[in-house]
A protein has these predicted regions:
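Charged DNA-binding/catalytic regions of mobile-element recombinases
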Residues: 1-151
Length: 151
């Protein structure tokens, strides 16, 4: 099976949608830049949003903080050793591992195979996987329904 990979997603707490993500063979600044660029190209008005993360070195980096500040995004970090602040993303990671990875580890012989499986899973998670918290809809459907009802 393929070795280690690092997934860096942005999860919208409104509907649980994975807004942007990147998978890399190492945790690095390029991975975080790509993830942010994907999020910024998908959503234009980000003023006042809160970006919460753990205290990983990538999220403490000056360039990362500057990019958030340029878009008017407020940076928030969990205190050290406080996993409860990150329970939403940790829950997503647990669901992804349970539904996409566990029992299939030996299928992913290359990074490309793992990347494709995660891309397919995130599409499924956003578009098809229903959740009771959002009225038994998928994250995308919930957002679309909310917007159409709001307008």
């Amino acid at each position: 099976p393929f070795g280690k990979a690092y997934l860096s997603p942005i999860l919208d707490m409104f509907n649980g949608e994975v807004i942007a993500w990147d998978l890399s063979t190492s945790a690095n600044n390029q991975q975080i830049r790509k993830m942010l660029q994907r999020a910024f190209s998908k959503h234009k008005n980000l003023e006042g949003l809160i970006f919460h993360s753990d205290q990983g070195w990538q999220y403490q980096h000056r360039q990362f903080s500057e990019k958030l500040k340029q878009k008017g995004i407020i940076q928030s970090m969990s205190p050290k050793g406080n996993c409860l602040d990150n329970s939403v993303i940790e829950s997503f990671f647990g669901t992804l591992k349970r539904e996409c990875f566990y029992g299939r580890e030996k299928e992913f012989l290359t990074f490309k195979q793992l990347h494709k499986a995660i891309a397919n899973y995130i599409y499924y998670y956003n578009h098809k996987r229903i959740k009771d918290r959002i009225k038994w809809m998928s994250p995308i459907k919930f957002r679309e329904t909310f917007i159409s009802n709001y307008n």
